[in-house]
């Protein structure tokens, strides 16, 4: 083995290998360059390492001759004529440029395009995802390019359902690098939102109208600037191809096609997602994005994913309601039994009064003449006392009202004894009904049947929520006729 130390470029160093050498170890500017050239060269492969870059190739018969000629000419010229020629300088410059292109601005090796190139060569599908948060906002995870356009980053964007799509467009524009227009001025790229159109009358691009417009312009301009007209036709052809790409046959509909349509930027995000939920995805198109990122497919969450936090909150509230419902059920049962005992006690008092009047009227010397005014006055006094009682408590004069009053009074005492706060109970019931109503609305959007008993977890919780809804619906029905009478 012969070691050569030279400051000449790679080609000159290779020419220094003579025909008789079996292998050569070449060191160039403190960089190890290994080249094994066994003679009589039975192998055709060689590998050169320069600044960490591996270059492989095939050695042909012509290369062998060039090595031989270079070696012989070097022996004839001598050491003083070993000056780098233009071809050698071009070779070194090309390798340096290749090495510089493989590093980004921060000096990190990006391996020829970074993750964008890797994803495109592997054929991976770059897609985003829409998630929900406990605060009932949407979290959009979308892959976007960095400023140097050599890498892809997952960007998380929090959006409110009542915000317009234009707000989401501005958020995406702030994360992507600007593009240059025809005048060389930088501007934010245009962002469009496309969703599947499930109606039968799909909106189709009228390509014939564009072609007719081009022909008319060409005729008016007198046939000049054919390149501009041809370019405009290519643009419309690209638009038509884009819409052809955003087209797929409907499931179970034979040859019928489903098309995607672009939504206005003034549409609320909640309405857009509600419509895109039927197709389970929508597309975000970014102007000037690298290959593979012009159309980002964003997966819309399913019903279970969309209502996950709502159902978890409902289950948590249901467990609290269940613990209170057990104690409340015992207190209510005791209160009802107490009210029944009060009613039976009132009947016993009336029966005892009837027996006294009978005894005093027919079995004593008082007789009917004395007992008649007594019974009349006692009955009238009882009626007047009851009337005053209903006026004082502002209640309707009925047995049901008196029974409810008795039950409620007994319930309050029992609740205080058991440590139940009615305000907490009512707030939990109202919140559970509100969450249930929201989940029902989302289920209607997704066209699914939601079994509320699985999340409410107990029949007593279901009955408590249903009872509260009935009370509210009954009060609303009673208030509506009153409002109508007031309007009249």
UniProtKB/Swiss-Prot annotation:
Sequence motif Selectivity filter, residues: 368-376
Effect of substituting residue 369 to N: Slightly reduced calcium channel activity. Decreased inhibition by ruthenium red derivative Ru360
Similarity field: Belongs to the MCU (TC 1.A.77) family.
GO molecular function, one term: uniporter activity
One GO cellular component term: uniplex complex
Purpose: Highly selective calcium channel localized to the inner mitochondrial membrane, which mediates calcium uptake into the mitochondrial matrix. Mitochondrial calcium homeostasis plays key roles in cellular physiology and regulates ATP production, cytoplasmic calcium signals and activation of cell death pathways. Sufficient to operate as a pore-forming channel without the need of calcium-sensor or auxiliary subunit.
Activity regulation (record text): Inhibited by ruthenium red or its derivative Ru360.
One GO biological process term: calcium import into the mitochondrion
Species of provenance: Neosartorya fischeri (strain ATCC 1020 / DSM 3700 / CBS 544.65 / FGSC A1164 / JCM 1740 / NRRL 181 / WB 181)
Reaction catalysed by this enzyme: Ca(2+)(in) = Ca(2+)(out)
Source domain of life: Eukaryota
Region (Disordered): 65-117, 464-488
PANTHER family given in the database record: CALCIUM UNIPORTER PROTEIN, MITOCHONDRIAL
Ranges of Basic and acidic residues composition bias in the record: 86-112, 475-488
Pfam families the record matches: MCU
Effect recorded for residue 368 to A: Abolished calcium channel activity
Compartment(s) where it occurs, according to its Swiss-Prot or TrEMBL record: Mitochondrion inner membrane
Protein name, as recorded: Calcium uniporter protein, mitochondrial
Subunit text: Homotetramer, assembles in a dimer or dimers configuration with two interfaces.
Residues involved in Ca(2+) binding: 372
């Amino acid at each position: 083995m012969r070691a050569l130390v030279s400051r000449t470029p790679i080609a000159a160093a290779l020419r220094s290998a003579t025909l008789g050498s079996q292998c050569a170890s070449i060191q160039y500017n403190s960089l190890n360059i290994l080249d094994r050239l066994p003679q009589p060269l039975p192998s055709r492969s060689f590998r050169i390492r320069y600044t960490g870059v591996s270059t492989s190739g095939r050695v042909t018969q012509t290369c062998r001759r060039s090595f031989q000629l270079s070696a012989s000419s070097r022996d004839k010229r001598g050491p003083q004529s070993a000056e780098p020629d233009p071809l050698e300088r071009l070779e070194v410059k090309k390798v340096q440029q290749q090495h510089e292109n493989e590093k980004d601005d921060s000096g990190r090796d990006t391996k020829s395009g970074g993750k964008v190139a890797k994803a495109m060569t592997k054929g991976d599908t770059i897609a985003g995802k829409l998630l929900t948060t406990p605060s009932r906002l949407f979290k959009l995870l979308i892959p976007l390019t960095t400023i140097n356009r050599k890498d892809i980053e997952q960007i998380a964007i929090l959006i409110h359902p009542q915000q317009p799509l234009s707000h989401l467009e501005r958020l995406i524009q702030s994360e992507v690098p600007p593009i240059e227009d025809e005048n060389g001025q930088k501007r934010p790229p245009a962002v469009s939102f496309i969703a599947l159109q499930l109606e039968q009358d799909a909106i189709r691009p009228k390509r014939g109208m564009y072609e007719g417009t081009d022909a008319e312009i060409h005729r008016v301009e007198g046939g000049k600037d054919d390149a501009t007209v041809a370019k405009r036709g290519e643009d419309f052809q690209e638009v038509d191809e884009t819409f052809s790409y955003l087209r797929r046959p409907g499931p179970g509909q034979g040859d019928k096609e489903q098309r995607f349509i672009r939504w206005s930027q003034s549409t609320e995000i909640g309405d857009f997602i509600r419509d895109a939920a039927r197709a389970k995805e929508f597309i975000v198109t970014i102007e000037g994005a690298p290959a593979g990122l012009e159309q980002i497919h964003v997966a819309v969450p399913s019903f279970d994913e969309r209502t996950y936090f709502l159902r978890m909150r409902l289950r948590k509230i249901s467990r609290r309601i269940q613990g209170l419902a057990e104690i409340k059920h015992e207190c209510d049962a005791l209160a009802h039994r107490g009210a029944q005992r009060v009613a039976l006690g009132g009947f016993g008092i009336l029966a005892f009064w009837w027996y006294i009047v009978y005894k005093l009227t027919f079995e004593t010397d008082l007789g009917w003449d004395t007992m008649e005014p007594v019974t009349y006055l006692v009955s009238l006094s009882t009626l007047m006392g009851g009337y005053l009682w209903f006026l004082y408590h502002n209640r309707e004069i009925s047995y049901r009202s008196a029974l409810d009053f008795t039950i409620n009074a007994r319930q309050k005492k029992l609740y205080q004894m058991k440590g139940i706060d009615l305000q907490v109970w009512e707030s939990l019931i109202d919140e559970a009904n509100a969450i249930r109503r929201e989940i029902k609305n989302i289920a209607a959007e997704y066209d699914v049947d939601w079994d509320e008993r699985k999340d409410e977890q107990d029949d007593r919780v279901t009955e408590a929520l249903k009872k509260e809804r009935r009370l509210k619906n009954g009060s609303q029905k009673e208030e509506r006729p009153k409002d109508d009478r007031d309007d009249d």
